[in-house]
């Protein structure tokens, strides 16, 4: 799931993420009696083709960005502006989190939605 970020106006996207988190909670309750853990991972911003297109659109619409590459625009506008750690997440970051949830080390964790987003959701 994408990162949970206040101020975003993409209602269908955010509602679907909220539904998955609620579904995670409900499944954890229902499946716990069978010793099944259910958790969700909420990734932050990961450089993808969609982000490339968004960055390219920003460059096209803003002359001040013409000297920047799409990745540089992404890093400035999507990563540094939104995350206290100032770095985007990688597929490996998400994979490590999923591997943790699949391991015995997380045997007492269920019904959680873990944000792996560089602190983007801190209040």
Locate the predicted segments by residue.
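Conserved SDR Rossmann-fold cofactor-binding beta-strand/turn motif
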Residues: 37-43, 47, 102, 115-117
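Short-chain dehydrogenase/reductase
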Residues: 24-25, 95-98, 102
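C-terminal beta-strand-loop-alpha-helix "lid" module of Rossmann-like NAD(P)-dependent dehydrogenases
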Residues: 57-58, 63-76
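Short, flexible catalytic-loop segment of classical short-chain dehydrogenase/reductase
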Residues: 42-53, 57, 61-62
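Short C-terminal tail/terminal secondary-structure segment
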Residues: 5, 98-99, 110-123
